[in-house]
A protein has these predicted regions:
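Conserved catalytic cores of very large enzyme subunits
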Residues: 1-369
Length: 369
């Protein structure tokens, strides 16, 4: 089964990490015995976009008197009926500056306290004394930010506000290019977002002079981050799961598997050395009629994807009906060891929470190449 393994590109990792590297965490490479990583969760760039629109006020959390909480810097909110791309980008850039600063500062505190109270002396004794340290950061809500900015740029996005003047939802008028369709108009925004946030993170001092890196990898926390984030201009409903990692948003991919892979392959690995996790679900029939034909076609798909410089791919080959049946009838013997790739790791489907199972079912299942 393809879901029991993940595929990573040695051609992009070997020049960075050398011949003797290992995969740690989920998809991240590391020089074996020579380095360690300060792990750092993710920054919710989708929520950051809403902060830019709402002047740093939180769309979910309230003060004791029921007013929106001023969680970010008190910048002037956007008050126009329709979102202007240049205005949004200016405010978003400022809000990302603030987020990168507070993100790195908090991670510095966490790593300092971890070393103070739970230093991993036994593990460090097995590593070279001249240790290379990387400072891991990450991005959550990636595809939704890309599609939201694309909607603002190429369509008309009307803001729906509540009695407090908070943007609570958006009405998009017209079509716009979405990440995951091999359309450079959207994919260029994706590349910009990745490069920009890492550059902002690198402006700040990191604990023990570690090297800042980033990832587009959320594991199953895409569900948790989504729970805290309101509606977005790309059409994602409030407090629903994000697409995981660098995977395009659910339903955004309209041109088949290859177009989706081509979009993700444009993300430069050197700007996300902790990993660019991509999880794709493919209906068996999309790969061919016979088992041999499917294997052969999948090999060609992987070769084409990785030849473009892509970093990582999880492949699930099954139909959605099987997932739905497994969710409703977990007692069936055939599902006891039914394993899927969620994001950076493999798990038995019946061991996921129902909320996580529904998230997996909601993902795009490619019916065509």
């Amino acid at each position: 089964t393809t879901s029991s393994v993940q595929y990573e590109n040695d051609d992009v990792m070997r020049p960075v990490w050398g011949d003797d590297y290992s995969i740690c965490c989920c998809v991240s490479a590391t020089q074996t015995g020579k380095e360690m990583q300060f792990f750092g969760a993710r920054a919710n760039l989708a929520k950051c976009l809403l902060y830019a629109i709402n002047g740093g006020k939180d769309e979910k959390y309230k003060t004791k008197d029921g007013k929106p909480m001023q969680a970010g810097p008190e910048y002037a909110p956007i008050t126009s009926e329709y979102l202007d791309y240049d205005e949004v980008m200016h405010k978003y850039d400022l809000m990302m500056d603030w987020l990168a600063g507070i993100y790195v500062n908090i991670l510095n505190l966490i790593q300092y306290m971890h070393d103070k109270y739970y230093y991993e002396a036994a593990e460090m004794a097995l590593i070279d004394t001249d240790v290379r340290r990387t400072f891991a950061t990450g991005i959550a809500g990636f595809s939704h930010v890309v599609d939201s900015l694309s909607a603002i740029k190429y369509a008309k996005v009307k803001v729906v506000r509540d009695e407090n003047g908070m943007a609570t939802s958006f009405v998009t008028e017209g079509d716009f290019p979405r990440y995951g369709n091999d359309d450079d108009r959207a994919d260029d925004i994706a590349v910009w977002l990745l490069k920009t946030f890492l550059k902002k993170v690198k402006k700040y001092h990191t604990y023990r002079n570690s090297e800042p890196t980033t990832s587009i990898l959320t594991i199953t926390s895409n569900v948790v981050y989504g729970k805290a984030t309101g509606a977005l201009p790309d059409g994602r409903a409030a407090f629903t799961p994000f697409a995981p990692g660098a995977t395009p948003s659910y339903g955004a991919e309209q041109n088949g598997l290859l177009a989706s892979l081509n979009s993700v392959a444009k993300l430069p690995y050197e700007y996300a050395l902790d990993g660019i996790s991509n999880t794709e679900t493919i209906a068996p029939g999309a790969l061919g009629h016979s088992e041999d034909e499917r294997k052969n076609n999948l090999v060609h798909v992987l070769d084409g994807y990785f030849d473009q410089g892509a970093h990582h791919l999880n492949v699930n080959v099954f139909g959605l009906d099987k997932l739905k049946d497994a969710m409703e009838h977990p007692e069936k013997p055939e599902y006891a060891n039914f394993t899927i790739r969620v994001s950076g790791y493999a798990v038995k489907f019946i061991d996921l929470t129902r909320e996580q199972q529904l998230d997996v079912i909601a993902r795009t299942c490619h019916e065509a190449m």
